[in-house]
Every structure is written in C-alpha cells, then in structure tokens.
Amino acid sequence: MSMLALDVEKRLGDFALAARFETAGGVTALFGASGAGKTTLVNMIAGLIAPDRGRIRLDQTVLFDSAARIDVPVHRRRIGYVFQEGRLFPHLSVAANLDYGRRMCGLARDGAETARILDLLDIGHLLDRRPGKLSGGERQRVAFGRALLMRPRLLLLDEPLASLDAPRKREILPYLEKLRDEVPMVYVSHHAPELKRIATSVVLLDAGRVAATGGIEVLDAATAELMG
C-alpha cells in the first residue's frame, strides 16, 4: 500500500493552487468543478510540472522538495499515468505500445506478468493491431496495460472515461474495479456516479484549495450542495 503525501503551491496565470493532503492506498478520487486544479495536481505528482513551493512524497521517497532542491525526473518516479484520450502511439502496434513504458523505465521483460495483465484487461487478441483499428474502450484498456507494465507504485488516471460514450464507459468500469486491487490510484473525475463505484477516499477541490477529505460521504455532501 503506497502512501502519498503532498503540500504544494502553484500559480498559473491568475489561478493559484495551494493543496495539502495524504492518501493511504486504495483509490483516491480528486473531485471538483472544472478549473478546480485537479489536473494540475496530478501533473505535479507525475513530475510533468513542478510546484512553485512544497513537497511531494510517495512512501519513503521524496519526489519533490523545493527547500531541498529535489525534483525526481518523470521516468524515475515509477508512476503510471493514463490520460483522457489514452495517448497511444499511432504508428506502433498494441504490443509495442504496451512495451514502451517498461523500456522507458529500464525494466527487464517479465513474460508471466505481461501475460497476467493481458488477461486481466482482455487485450491479448489486440497485440498486432494499430491504435487506429481499436474502439475507444479498447484504446483505454491498452493505455491501462501500458501503465501497469511500468510496475508503478502509483497510477494516475485523469478523466479516463470522459471521452467515451455510455456503452464504452460501462465496458471499462469493470476493468477499473479490477485495477483497484492491483495498484494504488489517484482518480480525477467530475462524474460522481463513476467515483462512487471506484473510489475508496475523496479529496474535494474548490478553486485550487482542498475543501474536504474523507470517504464517499464527502462526495455525497459535495454533489448534494451542487444540486441544491
């Protein structure tokens, strides 16, 4: 079980983010309105952008510390990231896309683990295809597989179902429930029913600040307030 602890500040134009929270494994939902700072936060955890000030720690590894001038490079953080649109390489086969993360992290090939993930996500029959020949749901499952084959300590999912229609979302949700037992996750979404099915804890963001943290009851209270 990976513990993530962060205390960060970041200004982007007129937007100022100041967030502090800890997670203790499971699936932590980042919930809030558009522009609340959810994607900015996961990009800082991944190392894609640096906080102006603060500290990010995963288990006993300090990933970022402005005071100590620590900023671990993206490829050394061992954090998987699945974006809204999957971001597969269109010129590579599914097999080559899956292998990309492992190679970038310098990991040895593990045939048994690869076979297990192919079975977990039901993508073994897609290996010879190019992303352009996949459905939206298949592309996202391949993106999940690529992230898992990095053997991540943490998986970041930024609106992974937002680009899918309702049938494809129903197709993917059972696979996400399986992933919940594979690796700790930070899951970004503004869709409460989706989070209620997957999340084990919630961080509510409002205009760049942490408004509340806790269990699913935080989500219930937030959605009730929005509807009220």
Walk through the language-model features, giving the residues of each.
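Conserved ABC ATPase "signature" region
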Residues: T61-S66, R109-L126, E177
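ABC ATPase NBD coupling module
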Residues: L63-G80, M104
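Conserved ABC ATPase signature
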Residues: R130-L134, E138-Q140
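A short, proline-enriched helix->beta-strand linker immediately N-terminal to the Walker B motif
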Residues: L149-R153
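Helical segment within the ABC ATPase nucleotide-binding domain
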Residues: K169-E182
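Conserved H-loop
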Residues: V183-S189
